[in-house]
Amino acid sequence: MLENYKHTTVLLDEAVNGLNIRSGGIYIDGTFGRGGHSRLILSQLGPEGRLLAIDRDPQAIEAAKAIDDSRFSIIHGPFSAMADYVAELGLTGQIDGVLLDLGVSSPQLDDPERGFSFMRDGPLDMRMDPTRGSSAAEWLMKAEADDIVWVLKTFGEERFAKRIARAIVERNRTEPMTRTKELASLIAAASPIREKHKHPATRSFQAIRIYINSELEEIERALEGALSVLAPQGRLSVISFHSLEDRIVKRFIRHQSRGPQVPAGLPLTEEQLRSQGGQTLKPVGKKLMPSEAEVAENPRARSSVLRFAERLPA
């Protein structure tokens, strides 16, 4: 069933090239997905190189079985626990590069049984790991209207959040929603104005998905984890797909690259400043966006942003 859902890896070459792969290095693909980035990394590693992949989606773990390579291993779990996985392997501070491809994948969106898409009818689930936590239907059934409003506004910037939340609560009082099409139709009916070329449920589905999977908190923890496992000169390569994700990545790199704030004019070298603590990363190059050709081939790449950073010596 896995092969039925095609996945085109976004910014494939750019994201991997930014890792500056060393033949004998140790790398982490924190979001295996269907293995596009992992396969390219493996193709650039020598016999002594190693690649550790992570994914919390059981279908991704199943897809990884197709990679028969002694240099490769995969862990089923959230990338936010990266530091723990690496510590268990005794490799803290020895990782030469970490790649993160954030958000929901095409196979997750395209499989109606996963419940991520308002375009295809399926169970109202939305969990990246269906074996853990509450589904979207379960959460919506027990959530108060104010809680739903907060989620829709915070993670979806939905201006009709109150109308939609009220409609959800009223519907669930009479007959619980269990299908994606039910929720999408309800949101469309509750939205008085429609944006051109945008389904009324787009923002709400994004918001509920982000909340159900704790996506933004997971990203923050994953970035901290990457920082803790990287070796000096190790690279961080992160692809984000919407402004909420990119804002977290941008702020993290900026904060970690600023270092201690000291009065201007103090005669301190860069090494002395680093010894004060705080400056741990330096940005590498400018953010990258997909080319027009890539967007034409894969419209879902349109909103992607790729950022790089390099670990500074302690």
Swiss-Prot record:
<feature type="binding site">
    <location>
        <position position="55"/>
    </location>
    <ligand>
        <name>S-adenosyl-L-methionine</name>
    </ligand>
</feature>
<protein>
    <recommendedName>
        <fullName>Ribosomal RNA small subunit methyltransferase H</fullName>
        <ecNumber>2.1.1.199</ecNumber>
    </recommendedName>
</protein>
<keyword id="KW-0963">Cytoplasm</keyword>
<comment type="similarity">
    <text>Belongs to the methyltransferase superfamily. RsmH family.</text>
</comment>
<keyword id="KW-0808">Transferase</keyword>
<keyword id="KW-0698">rRNA processing</keyword>
<feature type="binding site">
    <location>
        <position position="108"/>
    </location>
    <ligand>
        <name>S-adenosyl-L-methionine</name>
    </ligand>
</feature>
<comment type="function">
    <text>Specifically methylates the N4 position of cytidine in position 1402 (C1402) of 16S rRNA.</text>
</comment>
<feature type="binding site">
    <location>
        <begin position="35"/>
        <end position="37"/>
    </location>
    <ligand>
        <name>S-adenosyl-L-methionine</name>
    </ligand>
</feature>
<dbReference type="Pfam" id="PF01795">
    <property type="entry name" value="Methyltransf_5"/>
</dbReference>
<feature type="binding site">
    <location>
        <position position="79"/>
    </location>
    <ligand>
        <name>S-adenosyl-L-methionine</name>
    </ligand>
</feature>
<dbReference type="InterPro" id="IPR029063">
    <property type="entry name" value="SAM-dependent_MTases_sf"/>
</dbReference>
<keyword id="KW-0949">S-adenosyl-L-methionine</keyword>
<keyword id="KW-0489">Methyltransferase</keyword>
<dbReference type="GO" id="GO:0070475">
    <property type="term" value="P:rRNA base methylation"/>
</dbReference>
<dbReference type="GO" id="GO:0071424">
    <property type="term" value="F:rRNA (cytosine-N4-)-methyltransferase activity"/>
</dbReference>
<feature type="binding site">
    <location>
        <position position="101"/>
    </location>
    <ligand>
        <name>S-adenosyl-L-methionine</name>
    </ligand>
</feature>
<dbReference type="InterPro" id="IPR002903">
    <property type="entry name" value="RsmH"/>
</dbReference>
<dbReference type="GO" id="GO:0005737">
    <property type="term" value="C:cytoplasm"/>
</dbReference>
<feature type="region of interest" description="Disordered">
    <location>
        <begin position="276"/>
        <end position="296"/>
    </location>
</feature>
<dbReference type="InterPro" id="IPR023397">
    <property type="entry name" value="SAM-dep_MeTrfase_MraW_recog"/>
</dbReference>
